[in-house]
């Protein structure tokens, strides 16, 4: 059995959409890279965010950056919804990789709770459940096959692809929408800071990297905000 990638969408610091991402990559340009202060006490860091505005979400308990990215992907690439029409809702699964989904929003709510002494009205604990992004995408597409999130830190999205292929190989699904979606949060930033894994100049492939992080060239995978790739993996 052979699986093939039939469609995909990406949004990152390089831009929104496949064409813009490729064009900026070729030019060596990343419009979403900015120096930010406040996440880590006493220092600023270079960080990659998706440039531009993201679609709004009316549902209070679903309104977080990772879900807005998923909505952007579905609105930008109709081929994902077409998988459900082609194979039937019961034969389309969803497997996403995510680690920090909803954490940034939760941090803001907790700060407000501590400051005011009252739980914020918009705060919903389901926002930090790891399964939330996959369930939200299920609602957007109307898929009724297996739906879950893989959360194994930086390897999450890669493992999601493997899980998607196994669902197809086992005959459980004819198509799976898979990939990775995540957002920035202080929790993750301070974790990488504690490991000494953040480069002051944010040049992961430069020969001028500080010695203690030369062996961690892939570290920026962990510090790139809202890196997202949606792929429809279909059975031939």
Predicted regions and their residues:
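Hydrophobic pocket-lining residues that define ligand/cofactor binding sites across diverse proteins
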Residues: 167-168
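Internal active-site segments that recognize and position negatively charged phosphoryl groups
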Residues: 163
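Glycine- and other small-residue-rich loops at beta-strand/loop junctions that grip anionic moieties
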Residues: 126, 150-153
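Active-site histidine-anchored catalytic micro-motif
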Residues: 160
């Amino acid at each position: 059995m052979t699986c093939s990638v039939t469609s995909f969408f990406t949004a990152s610091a390089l831009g929104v959409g496949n064409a813009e991402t490729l064009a900026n990559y070729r030019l060596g340009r990343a419009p979403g890279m900015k120096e930010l202060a406040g996440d880590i006490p006493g220092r600023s860091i270079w960080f990659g965010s998706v440039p531009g505005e993201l679609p709004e979400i009316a549902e209070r308990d679903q309104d977080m950056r990772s879900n807005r990215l998923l909505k952007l992907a579905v609105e930008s690439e109709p081929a994902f919804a077409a998988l459900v029409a082609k194979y039937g809702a019961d034969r389309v699964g969803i497997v996403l990789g995510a680690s920090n989904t909803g954490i940034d929003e939760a941090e803001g709510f907790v700060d407000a709770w501590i400051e005011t002494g009252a739980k914020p009205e918009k705060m919903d604990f389901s926002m930090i459940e790891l399964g939330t992004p996959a369930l939200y995408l299920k609602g957007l597409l109307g898929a009724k096959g297996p739906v879950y999130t893989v959360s194994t830190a930086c390897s999450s999205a890669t493992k999601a692809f493997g899980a998607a292929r196994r669902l197809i190989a086992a005959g459980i699904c004819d198509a799976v929408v898979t990939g990775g979606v995540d957002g920035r949060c202080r929790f993750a930033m301070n974790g990488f800071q504690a490991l000494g894994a953040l480069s002051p100049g944010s040049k992961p492939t430069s020969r001028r990297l500080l010695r203690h992080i030369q062996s961690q060239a892939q570290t920026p995978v962990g510090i790139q905000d809202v890196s997202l790739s949606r792929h429809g993996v279909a059975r031939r």
